[in-house]
Each structure stands twice: as C-alpha cells, then as structure tokens.
Amino acid sequence: MKRKVALGCVLMLSAMTVLSGCGGGGDSEGGTSEGGKTKIRFASWDVAEDVDRQQAIVDKFNESHDDIEVTLEAYGSDFDTKISAGMGSGDTPDVMYMWNYPAYYEGLEPLDEYIENEGEEYKTNFYDTLWNYNSIDGQIYGVPVGFTTHALFYNKDLFTEAGIEEPTGDWTWDDLQTAAKTISEKTDAKGFAFSMKPDPYDFEMYLWSNGTAYCDEEGNMDGYINSAESEEVFQMFQDMEKDGYAIATEKNGTDEFRAGQVAMYVYGSWSINTLNEDGMNYGVTKIPSFGSQPSVSILSSSGVSMSKDSENKEAAWEFIKFWTNEECNKERIGLELPVLNSVVESEKIMEQAEYAPFYVMLEQSDGYTPASFIMESWSEVSEDLSLAFEEAFNPSTLLDVKEVLESSVQ
C-alpha cells in the first residue's frame, strides 16, 4: 500500500468542488470491445515494479474471464488530479484505488448491496475495523485491499550496547523515556525520534490513546485539542526533545533509524521491506501506552471503489471481487498488509514478529473515527494544525504547548 487514507486531505476542497458539478455521463472508453468483451478501466496510484505486479494480476483476471477485459491505468503521483478531473467530466475509470473518501465519495458507487449479496461470510472475512475506514455516513464506498497501523520500531543492537532490555508489548511511555535516556547516555545515538511537523491525521492516535481527540462527534474542537489530556501528550514529546534524548526530524524518522542515529521511532509497516533489505537488526512492538489505557493507532487504509458513473457496474464488481479475493491478497503481500482473516491465518502472519504488532494495534484501535472523517473543513484545519505542531516541536521555536493548543481552537 502506497497511499495514506487522508494524507492531509490536501485535495479535499478542490475535489469536493469538482464533485459537486459532476453529472451523469459514463466512461468514454467503457462498453464492449470488438471481441464482445465488456471493457472496464482500473486506476492505480502505484509506480515502477509495483505496477508490474499489479499488471500480472490484471492479466490473470483477463485470462480467466471470457466476457470482461480490464485495462490497468497507472496514474502514479497524478492519481488525485486525474480522478478529480475524471469525476468532473464523467470520464472516471470504472474501478479505482481509493483513500480519501471524504473528498471523493460523492463520485463513488455505494457497495453495501453488492457486499450483502455475497453473503455474510464474505464481509466478515475482512477485519471489521477496515470497513469503518472505507465508509462515509454508514455507507461503504470501498472494499479494503491494504492497510497499516503504526507500531514502535527499535534497534536491537543499540539496546544491547546500552545494556538494557528490549521493548515489550506492555511498555508505557514512561518505560520508553527511561530507555531513551539510557541509550542517549551510553551510546552515540539518541533514544527516540519523531517528526517536528507530524501529519495531523497520524498524530491524533496519541490523543486517542490518552482519552481525548481533536474534536467531538460534531466537529467541535474546544475542550478536545486543548484539553489537559491533549496538553499532556504534546508536552511529553516536547520535553523529550528539550531534555536531549529525543530528536524531532524533518521527515518521519526512518532515515535516522536506518542510519543508527536513533534507537526507536513509531511508524507504519511501509519501512519493513527497506529495513530487511538493509539487513538491520531491528524489532517491532506495540505503541507504548499512557498508564493503564491501551494504546491506539491511526489506520492508513486503501480500498477499491467503483465509479457511480460506470456503465458496467456488474463487470466492475466482478473485478473488485477478484482483486480482493484470497489469492490476490496473498500475491500483494509486500505491497500491502493482508486484510483477510483467512490469509493472515494461512500465511501465519501473526507468527512473523515484524508484522504481528500491526494486527494487534488494529484490534486495539476499533471504534475510533479520525477528525478528517468528521470535520467538513478538515483540509483547512489540518494545515493549521500542522503549522501549530511545528511551532511546538521545531527545535528553533519550541513554543509553549498550552498556548499552541489554545490557538488551534481560535
């Protein structure tokens, strides 16, 4: 999985504007080919070798279906631009990868009836939490294909060098800070790294873990983003930086972790392949908790959706079913974490130490709704929060946390 569900939702407002003006019209290249096959288009955001792997799966579908022909359209970094333009002109691909449902759902076909017709076993084979991230206002607009939660990565060699025990699943943030201090004192590395300008979508998980959020169910921020629980979270991160055993990085911390400059950081499963290729001696465990409260993670999730304007919806659904079946879920391991219970079991994913924590965090994170799914003005709010967070965490500023959070609700 290459995309994050609401990567700042930077295109939300423009996409909503486009969607508000889109009308009927089908896709311009849909219909029937000369061979009598129903032609459908499938849009992906992947690039390079990932596209090659996707094309191989599309080829398998085409070879096994005499009546449907799928064409893969790899948009890469132009994905959002082309999907928005397609929805505005009525020329959207029949099937597409999807992440930013708040922005695009008006141009998508609700899939509840299709899913219901497949029977209860079809839906329950997916991890239930993932349906929440592929739905808007109780309606499902995408079938899950990939996800990641976040977990704590740690450098085993640095823990050995510092002479301390490795992190465990019952760690609290106090435990992490104690270890980070020791590592900073006994090695040339810092104990922990986090982004000086974290993605607000991601950072809300820390507030959830401490009993609060950015806003309530109506989108009201006052009393939430500036609550005592929220202040405690932000103050903890800032204090770790001030005390010198954590660093605030320009990106997400992966570069510093790979270089052996930091012993721990929290991130999604995206870096696993890279760390394995590096031959790094690392471990993964759950995000630490605040006291006795279970830690919670945000989900970065992707689904496969159908255009509401598709003239070939039955064929599109047939392809969606194929793309989300067990065989294809297995073939995409490495691109995306499996979303089917049956595949996780058959491939013994929970026995793989680097992957299991992401599923444990998935189970612990059910029932939380990101502010991006609640607030209509999330695009603007996200930009404001990002700037505010940078003021609190940038080592050149380190503004007062309470003042920063109060300014976020004004």
Feature map (PLM): residue ranges:
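Extracytoplasmic "Venus flytrap"/periplasmic binding protein-like
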Residues: 60-126, 161-163, 263-264, 274, ...
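Hinge/lid segment of periplasmic solute-binding proteins
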Residues: 98-149, 281-285, 350-354
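Extracytoplasmic/periplasmic solute-binding protein
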Residues: 139-145, 150, 160, 175-222, ...
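Short, low-complexity disordered leader/linker segments with a strong preference
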Residues: 1-41, 63, 406-410
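Mature extracytoplasmic/periplasmic domains
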Residues: 302-377
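Glycine-centered hinge/linker elements that transmit conformational signals in sensory
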Residues: 180, 219-248
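C-terminal capping/gating helix-and-loop segments adjacent to ligand/active sites or protein-protein/ligand interfaces
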Residues: 71, 135, 338-341, 356-410
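A structural signal for short loop-to-beta-strand junctions that line the ligand-binding cleft
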Residues: 85, 94, 120-158, 294-296, ...
